[in-house]
Amino acid sequence: VKQIIATVPLFDLGRGAFCDASLFQGIDLDTLRSIEADWTPIFDAAAPENPPEDAHWEWAAKALQALQNPLSYELFGIEADARTQGMMLVVKGGPKCFSRHPEHPRAPLIYVDFLATAPWNRPGLTATPTYKGVGRLLFMTAVSLSIEEEFAGRIGLHSLPGAEAFYRNRLNMTDMGKDDAYQNLRYFELSTTQARQLIAARP
């Protein structure tokens, strides 16, 4: 079931102004069709020698995973112009949801399993991105969920190589190094202190 939970501001790069977008929880067939119809052709048209790192992600399978395990998974997305602008799947419990950060070892956290913005919002895929801020809005939604679950804003995730700078520099997460138990991807955490700072810095 898909439910709109908030109106959020997205920066329209073409107009140079903020516009209203919908933050939703859950997913429906229309959203899955939107991703398939709108995202996939752009991914398919990308240079084969340099495909987007997340082009192979199957959001229908992720939706099914969330529907079958509602206590462990949550899906969130952002919609504007009747198109899906970004999607995120988070994990609320299980082996991935324990901190490795020295500030609070083994403390519970929200694990961001998958986070993707629509291809037309990515500078690497288009010379004129449509919206800015989709990834940050989804990430802050995960932080809010972490607070709601009484995890003090703590977040953990493994980053694709192309997104490492975003998590390290834009969100000021702690780079915990490469995880040889997880496809050698770098593992990042947002500690309790970092979550507090990120929330305080939010415009």
Residues of each region from the PLM?
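Non-catalytic substrate-recognition and accessory regions of acyl/acetyltransferase enzymes
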Residues: 1-129, 137, 144-154, 162-203
